[in-house]
Amino acid sequence: VFKLEGSDNIKLVVDELPNFRTRDLVVMWGTIEGEPFYFLVSHWPSRLGGKEASQFKRDACAKQIKEIKDELIAQNPATKVIVMGDFNDDATDASITKVMGAKGKEKELVEGDFFNPFNQMLRAGLGTLAYQDVWNLFDNICVTENLVNAEEGKLRIIKGKKFYGNIFTRPYMLQQEGQYKGYPLRTFVTNNFQNGFSDHFPVYIYIGK
């Protein structure tokens, strides 16, 4: 059971655009079975105007999240940090792998690193949203190395049959026919109500001992 100790919202800053407004970073902290956890939830700026032209905005978010994580680990190396959200970048994009420093393989991890279990899932052809028949994986959950290489008896990320990450899908969540068969069933297409749930599939991980 997660015991909440506090929460806050942090303004995401893009240095090149001091007046730029985007969604805040929502954070909360507390304990699970006595172990310190810190959660960050973030929805990064869109690719409006093109991926490359808007990249610096998402890079700024990634940089700020890494700085927060580094400070938390420096203060208490036992803190287990989890960041999640729609990053509007794929798990293999440089904003996540380079700027935020999230590694895709356990063997690459060093103390304090982020691990992104969805990196290998994207490389295997899985995704949470599709555009022009190409799957993307913008929805990520990254955890600090101490949730991968946890001490015996401590909480850790649990691996499934093949991956540490999971994408939740059910038939009622899928477009059943037409050009977009197999895509997530959206709530709206332009102004037309589709009675769907989202244009993204949700993602999740398991934490246990």
Which residue stretches match the model-derived regions?
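Structured beta-strand-rich core segments of catalytic domains in phosphoester-bond hydrolases
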Residues: 1-36, 40-44
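Second-shell loop/turn segments in exported
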Residues: 14-16, 49-58, 83-84, 126-129, ...
